[in-house]
């Protein structure tokens, strides 16, 4: 289980507070202006026609607000929401049980929708297109099919891996929206909003310091704020200034560009052991004692996005920007 402070994945201990931090309406939702603006138009149009909203696919890196947007869609449409995840729907009966509880207009949110089996996908197709469910019971010559009518509903699917969705499933979504990494000023606004909910006083500069180290991800920004709050509480203050915030983050080994100890170890190994690369993924994994899949799925995306690392046909290479950040250029000179 990935328990990195800078992990974009949801961590179990965050459940109790996370829901209370989530915005409930578009006007409270910071960032993702393009996706938010388009969704708002589609929702208003559906309401004007007294129709259900088309099925929506949200994709992008973890921690950017896909689950929150699904809840906001339901709130803005004035309907209920049922929430599940791809791995939880193992058998046709699991899907039938969920679909049979939907009220007219409800939102069904399926997180990690790319992890649905092909069998479940095929049952989902008529449910999405014709609002009906075909259930087969019995085997061989005794097999019988029963069609169950469903109320109109909106399926909101969320995935971090849109490419893993089958084309037939992907094509049945009328609305497809990509969520992008957040800008620093957007994350600073999120940190300030969360601090207010925590009844903390935080300066704009301190919010900015936390935002810069949050890897473009609200989930990480809120997690870092929780840890900075711990340092503030032990120091006997409810006021977070830039000095306190920066000191706390330094002690947590999160540098000014949002890199932690694992990132440092990976990038330094590439320079000090392999001259900056190219180096193969398996070789790099063995060198730093990490799983190759974990490096590829968890560590690399941010390093690639920020220009610290590049992939080539011959392997991974560190960039000049990364060398400058770690001071290797000066040493070479």
Swiss-Prot record:
Mg(2+) binds at residue 67. Its EC number is 3.6.4.-. It is found in: Cytoplasm. Pfam families: AAA_lid_4 (PF17864), RuvB_C (PF05491), RuvB_N (PF05496). Keywords: ATP-binding, Cytoplasm, DNA damage, DNA recombination, DNA repair, DNA-binding, Hydrolase, Nucleotide-binding. Residues 256-333 are annotated as: Head domain (RuvB-H). GO terms for molecular function: ATP binding; ATP hydrolysis activity; four-way junction DNA binding; four-way junction helicase activity. DNA binds at residues 311, 316. Residues 1-182 are annotated as: Large ATPase domain (RuvB-L). Homohexamer. Forms an RuvA(8)-RuvB(12)-Holliday junction (HJ) complex. HJ DNA is sandwiched between 2 RuvA tetramers; dsDNA enters through RuvA and exits via RuvB. An RuvB hexamer assembles on each DNA strand where it exits the tetramer. Each RuvB hexamer is contacted by two RuvA subunits (via domain III) on 2 adjacent RuvB subunits; this complex drives branch migration. In the full resolvosome a probable DNA-RuvA(4)-RuvB(12)-RuvC(2) complex forms which resolves the HJ. NCBIfam families: PRK00080.1 (NF000868), ruvB (TIGR00635). The RuvA-RuvB-RuvC complex processes Holliday junction (HJ) DNA during genetic recombination and DNA repair, while the RuvA-RuvB complex plays an important role in the rescue of blocked DNA replication forks via replication fork reversal (RFR). RuvA specifically binds to HJ cruciform DNA, conferring on it an open structure. The RuvB hexamer acts as an ATP-dependent pump, pulling dsDNA into and through the RuvAB complex. RuvB forms 2 homohexamers on either side of HJ DNA bound by 1 or 2 RuvA tetramers; 4 subunits per hexamer contact DNA at a time. This is Holliday junction branch migration complex subunit RuvB. It comes from Exiguobacterium sp. (strain ATCC BAA-1283 / AT1b). The gene is ruvB.
């Amino acid at each position: 289980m990935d328990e990195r402070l800078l992990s974009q994945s949801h961590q179990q201990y965050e459940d109790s507070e996370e829901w209370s931090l989530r915005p409930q309406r578009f006007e409270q939702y910071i960032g993702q202006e393009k996706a938010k603006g388009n969704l708002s138009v589609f929702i208003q149009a559906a309401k004007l026609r007294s129709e259900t909203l088309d099925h929506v696919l949200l994709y992008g890196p973890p921690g950017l607000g896909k689950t929150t947007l699904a809840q906001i869609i339901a709130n803005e449409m004035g309907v209920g929401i049922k929430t599940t995840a791809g791995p939880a729907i193992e058998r046709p009966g699991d899907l039938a049980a969920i679909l049979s509880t939907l009220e007219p207009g409800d939102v069904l949110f399926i997180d990690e929708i790319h992890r649905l089996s092909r069998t479940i996908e095929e049952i989902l197709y008529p449910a999405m297109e014709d609002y009906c469910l075909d259930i087969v019971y019995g085997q061989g010559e005794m097999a019988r099919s029963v069609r169950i009518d469903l109320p109109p509903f909106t399926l909101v699917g969320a995935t971090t891996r849109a490419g893993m969705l089958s084309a037939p499933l992907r094509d049945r979504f009328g609305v497809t929206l990509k969520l992008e990494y957040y800008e620093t000023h957007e994350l600073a606004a999120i940190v300030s909003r969360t601090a207010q909910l925590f009844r903390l006083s935080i300066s704009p500069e301190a919010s900015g310091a936390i935002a810069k180290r949050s890897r473009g991800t609200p989930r990480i920004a809120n997690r870092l704020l929780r840890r900075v709050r711990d340092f503030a509480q032990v120091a006997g203050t409810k006021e977070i200034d830039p000095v306190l915030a920066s000191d706390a983050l330094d002690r947590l080994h999160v540098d000014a560009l949002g890199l932690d100890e694992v990132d440092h170890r990976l990038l330094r190994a590439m320079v000090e052991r392999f001259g900056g690369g190219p180096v193969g993924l398996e070789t790099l994994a063995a060198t730093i004692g990490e799983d190759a899949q974990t490096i590829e799925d968890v560590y690399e995306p941010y390093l690639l996005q920020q220009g610290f690392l590049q992939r080539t046909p011959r392997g991974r290479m560190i960039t000049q920007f990364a060398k400058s950040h770690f001071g290797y250029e000066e040493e070479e000179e």
